[in-house]
Regions:
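Amphipathic alpha-helical segments used for helix-helix packing
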Residues: 90, 101-130, 174-178
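Short alpha-helical scaffolding segments that buttress acidic/His motifs in well-ordered protein cores
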Residues: 91, 95, 110-117, 162, ...
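Hydrophobic alpha-helical connector segments
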Residues: 71-107, 159
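C-terminal peripheral helix-coil segments that are non-catalytic and often amphipathic
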Residues: 97, 130-208
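An amphipathic alpha-helix adjacent to DNA-recognition modules
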Residues: 8-13, 47-70, 74-77, 81, ...
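Hydrophobic/aromatic residues within well-ordered alpha-helical segments
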Residues: 50, 57, 61, 65, ...
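Helix-turn-helix
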Residues: 10, 18-60
Length: 208
């Protein structure tokens, strides 16, 4: 069993790196197997097909992230009132904890989620929305509670604007922090970036 487990993890690790760098559409199974130094039959054995492999790569993060977000939001909703800042603040620690799933896990996860949209991976959005429906519904409910004036259409667009901002910021975090440190002669870390990001996202979601 050990060799199979090792092979499976190797495939996941290599696929993750290639998907993040080149996207889902431009990464073939042969490219993955070549870099992982395994045969195509190994991918078929462990995952069946490329779509299942894509989902498995994301689910390494999601299975750690979603229960943690759910706990944070349940705690938030024990209160009678809260604002948009506090909704986004509930995501901070769960997202940061992804760095313990994989090195630089938070940025990698956000980049992969972004790839899911830009590469039109409809099956991936379906997988996330069905497997983690309860958590996503709680998140949507929390946003609505924090800003009840939003229409369904406004919520749709603003959530996707928010996602785009997060994906760009986290995926480019190293370059952005280096530029900021050079320009302002001030040390910047990931926590500082998130501290700046949360009020910006909250203001965008609550814009009149």
């Amino acid at each position: 069993m050990a060799p199979r487990s090792t092979t499976k993890e190797k495939i996941l690790d290599v696929a993750e790196g290639l998907f993040a760098e080149y996207g889902f559409n431009d990464t073939s199974l042969r490219t993955i197997t070549g870099k992982a130094n395994v045969n195509l039959a190994s991918v078929n054995y462990h995952f069946g097909d490329k779509k299942t492999l894509v989902r498995a790569v994301l689910d390494r993060y999601l299975e750690a992230l979603m229960p943690s977000i759910q706990s944070s939001l349940i705690e938030l909703n024990t209160r009678d009132e809260y604002n948009m800042d506090e909704v986004f603040e509930s995501l901070r620690l769960p997202l940061r904890a992804l760095n313990s799933v994989r090195p630089n896990g938070t940025a990698l996860f956000m980049l992969l989620i972004g790839r899911g949209y830009t590469d039109v991976q409809g099956h991936l959005r379906w997988f996330i929305s069905t497997r983690y429906e309860e958590v996503l519904n709680l998140f949507m409910f929390s946003i609505s509670q924090a800003n009840s004036e939003l229409t369904e259409e406004q919520l749709f667009w603003r959530l996707h604007f928010t996602l785009g901002t997060c994906v760009f910021t986290m995926a480019s975090s190293q370059a952005l922090t280096e530029i900021a440190e050079s320009k302002f002669d001030k040390e910047v870390d990931a926590k500082s970036v998130v501290d700046l990001l949360i009020p910006y996202l909250s203001a965008g979601m609550s814009a009149k």
